[in-house]
């Protein structure tokens, strides 16, 4: 399983309301793209799905974020389990300053796996899942910092996969990459949806239209429109959506 249901979510930074009455169902094993102009709330919303906003002292939320019908903001919800089930890939590749192997093994070790055979199998499976195994299999002891930007981002995806999550959150994962590396990541994302629910923030509307099944358009902290990507881009119901995707603003 791996389905998020968000109900009447409001998020505040002090007195400033960054998200307003967000209600959305994010379907399992599909790619949902979050689009909208800078400052519209899409990255803030993404971070509510694994409670990264907890790190901001002035932040508080109202409403519910349900993962398979369990409220992740409930005091009874296990935060470590949330981090295991919901992986995160950031805009800038952020490998740890350690070997390729240790980058991928880091998460499983944190969750208590120490057996070398089990770790070896997880590392290989994760690197294969991130479509980078063939490029690094003979250099697993090499520093991750020596990889190219595109390889580092795929390594970060492998690191997220290694804890065997149900859901992957991606915050503009290709914005710092060249076009060839971007294409590899896009192909990889489409392969990953067979096994994972994927929610991706992107400023690149062409990317959203290429790879996603569903699209949510954010504006000033609200969702103006959510639906099948083909419908949002070819027959939007909200004039603001049409204005944005046609380039009239943003």
Curated annotation (Swiss-Prot):
Q: Which GO terms describe its biological process?
A: phosphate ion transmembrane transport
Instruction: Name a GO CC annotation attached to this entry.
Output: plasma membrane
Give the reactions, separated by semicolons, that this protein catalyses: phosphate(out) + ATP + H2O = ADP + 2 phosphate(in) + H(+)
Its predominant location is: membrane
One term of GO molecular function: ATP binding
Topology with regard to the membrane?
Peripheral membrane protein
> Which EC numbers characterise this protein's activity in its record?
7.3.2.1
Where does the record say this protein resides?
A: Cell membrane
Q: Does the keyword Nucleus apply?
A: no
Keywords of the record, alphabetical order, are: ATP-binding, Cell membrane, Membrane, Nucleotide-binding, Phosphate transport, Translocase, Transport
Which ranges carry the ABC transporter domain? 4-245
Identify the NCBIfam families for this entry: 3a0107s01c2 (TIGR00972)
Physiological role: Part of the ABC transporter complex PstSACB involved in phosphate import. Responsible for energy coupling to the transport system.
Q: Please give the PANTHER family that the UniProt record associates with this protein.
A: ABC TRANSPORTER I FAMILY MEMBER 17
Subunit structure, as described in the record: The complex is composed of two ATP-binding proteins (PstB), two transmembrane proteins (PstC and PstA) and a solute-binding protein (PstS).
Q: What is this protein called?
A: Phosphate import ATP-binding protein PstB 3
Recorded source organism is Streptococcus pneumoniae serotype 4 (strain ATCC BAA-334 / TIGR4)
């Amino acid at each position: 399983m791996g389905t998020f249901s968000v109900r009447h979510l409001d998020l505040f930074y002090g007195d400033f309301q960054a998200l307003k009455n967000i209600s959305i169902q994010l379907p399992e094993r599909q790619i949902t793209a979050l689009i909208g102009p800078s400052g519209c709330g899409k990255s803030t919303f993404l971070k509510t799905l694994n409670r990264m906003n907890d790190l901001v002292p002035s932040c508080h939320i109202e409403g519910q974020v349900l993962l398979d019908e369990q409220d992740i903001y409930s005091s009874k919800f296990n935060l470590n389990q949330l981090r295991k089930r919901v992986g995160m890939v950031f805009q800038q590749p952020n490998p740890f300053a350690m070997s390729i192997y240790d980058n991928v093994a880091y998460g499983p070790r944190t969750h208590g796996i120490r057996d070398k055979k089990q770790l070896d199998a997880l590392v290989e499976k994760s690197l294969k899942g991130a479509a980078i195994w063939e490029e690094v299999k003979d250099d697993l002891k090499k520093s991750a910092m020596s990889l190219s930007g595109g390889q580092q981002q795929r390594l970060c995806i492998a690191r997220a996969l290694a804890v065997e999550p149900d859901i992957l959150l991606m915050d503009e994962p290709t914005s710092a990459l060249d076009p060839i590396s971007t294409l590899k990541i896009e192909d990889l994302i489409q392969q990953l949806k067979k096994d994972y629910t994927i929610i991706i923030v992107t400023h690149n509307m062409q990317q959203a239209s290429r790879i996603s099944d569903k699209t949510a358009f954010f504006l000033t902290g609200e969702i103006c429109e959510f639906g099948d990507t083909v419908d949002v881009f070819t027959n939007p119901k909200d004039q603001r959506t049409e204005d944005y995707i046609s380039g009239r603003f943003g």
